[in-house]
Amino acid sequence: MAFYPDKINELFSAPKRTGKAAKTNAVGTGASFVCGSFVRVYLEIDAETKEIRDARYKTNGCGFTIAAAEVLAEKIVGQKLTDLHGLNHAEFLGEIESELGEFSADRRHCAEICFDALQAALTDFRALQIEEFAGEKALICTCFGISEDTIQGIISETSAETVEEVGDACNAGTGCGSCRFLIQELIDIHRLES
């Protein structure tokens, strides 16, 4: 008789995505004070296309944590960062539970620390984008490394009137969304000056 439910036991017994990604360029950690476990997520993200090429993890957690990390890693490989926009704890937990079965209240932190580690890795990638940016004008979209000059050029060339139109042209505003108000401000300024 297995200690864990069948699907969790299967992933716990034969994990496929442990270790570091070969070309890791984003790392994030999530930890639980409930049981003392941690998950560290290693991502390889294509700098041009912003596609997650590989996702790996390390953990000292239980079978529930390992299974949740396995499902997370499998689900995000091949996804573009824009595909993950707006993913929150509840949606993530729902996806994990649809794959593994419902986690009891005392096991939810096992999945939540995986999501925390993913968020931290994406934050790490954004920080790398900011560090690598070298330009005269401000960096508006840190998720995709899009400068004020680029956005102004798109607004002028395409007569973009919405943040969504700018996003369709260069992905700005389609990641975390924190730059959307700045993009709208640039659109409004262009409209006033035209």
Which residues are covered by each model-predicted region?
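Domain-level signature for proteins that mediate thiol-based redox and metal-cofactor handling
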Residues: 1-194
